[in-house]
Structures are given as structure tokens and as C-alpha cells.
Amino acid sequence: ILSTFAKQASVKEVLVIGGGVDKPIGEFDCSMQILKTGILQANGITKIGVAGHPEGSPDIADNEIKRALQEKNEFAIKENLNMYIETQFCFEAEMVLAWEKKAREDGNQLPIRIGIPGPATIKTLFRFAQISGIGPSMRFIAKQAGNVAKLMTVQSPHLLLAGLAEGMAADKACLIKHFHYYPFGGFVRTAKYARAISDGNVSLKTNGGFEIIEN
């Protein structure tokens, strides 16, 4: 299957993730086992994303996450792979920046793409946070979900993006290089939001963050 996709669709980049079940299905129980087979490299895959957990994982212990990230760093260097970290979605910049710095201190050298929840109602964000089982962000969004009047209010990630931008600018060694959006509020809405930011159609707010300028 991989060989067919790689040839017919010219696939050169994949995201390899594992976990999420109590009992592994099949012969692999973690992403490193797949990486070590060499099947990706053999089929011309030149760019590989692996999971990042700024808030930890409900399925994997923190010390195991740390060990796995160190192993992936070593493997990327050994195999000369173009590898990067793709993270779960988050809501608070301070937490993400602290995680990145700690991972760097622990030896991480892989560039990082941070998961950003696209514009969506608080009700929708709360539902996805529940499904993902993430911790601090769950508590963050739960506080807002507790206000019934705000449940259908569309939440923008402007404070998260602004906070990350400030942190990245202040720490030149920061390994956060890209963002990727989770289109919880719909693909079109998320795409329009991302395009507006890319085009610079934003206005800074006096109380922090920014807002999109509607054309």
C-alpha cells in the first residue's frame, strides 16, 4: 500500500503516530518500530513527522515520552532523516513555550510544528478537548464552557498565536518553526482565518492578541 501511494501520488512526507489504544492492533506498538523497519526511506519518504505532547498524553507516561523523543532524535541523526515534531492542539502559549524549552534542555533538536485549534465554538472545542484527554487545556476550556451563555461563542486562537510569536521572538534558540491548524470549526472557516493572518489582515488589540480585519 505504501509503495503504491508513494508512486502514484508522489508521497514524500508522512506523519507517523502511535498510541491511543490499550492493546496494540497488529505487530507494531509504537512509531519507532515503524521507523526502524526502513520501509519509509525505502519508498522515497524524505520528510517524517512524529508526535509531540506539550501537555503530556493520557496513554503514555511522561518519562516514556521523554525517552521516545530522545530516541527519535538519535535515530534522525543516525539515519540522516528530515524529521520534525507535530504536536497535539493546545490553548495556552506559556505552557507550550515551557514544554519546548524543557524538551530542548533534554536534548531535542528536531524542529517543531505547534497544533493550533482553528476558530470554533467553545462547545466544539470542549468536545474535542474531552475526546483528546489533554489536561491543562481541558481545564482552560472547561472554565469557559461552564458559562452556558458563551457555549456558542466562536473562540479565536489569537491570544495563543500572539503569545507564541512573542515567546519565539524572545528566545532565538526556540525550535518552534511552524504552526498547523486543527479545523474544529470547519475547514473553510479555518482556511479563511489562516489566510487573513498570512496576508496581514489583522489589527492588534489593546488588551492583548489581535483580531481579523474583515474585507
Q: Model-flagged regions — what are they?
A:
Residues 9, 30-50, 98-113, 192-210:
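Alpha-helix-loop-beta-strand connector modules within alpha/beta enzyme cores
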Residues 1-6, 63-70, 94-104, 122-124, ...:
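Catalytic cores of alpha/beta
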Residues 110-174:
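Catalytic-face loop-and-helix region of soluble metabolic enzyme cores
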Residues 22-30, 60, 87-102, 184-189:
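Active-site glycine- and acidic-residue-rich loops that bind
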Residues 72, 81, 114, 164, ...:
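Conserved, mostly hydrophobic/aromatic
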Residues 14-19, 83-92, 180-182:
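Catalytic beta/alpha-barrel core
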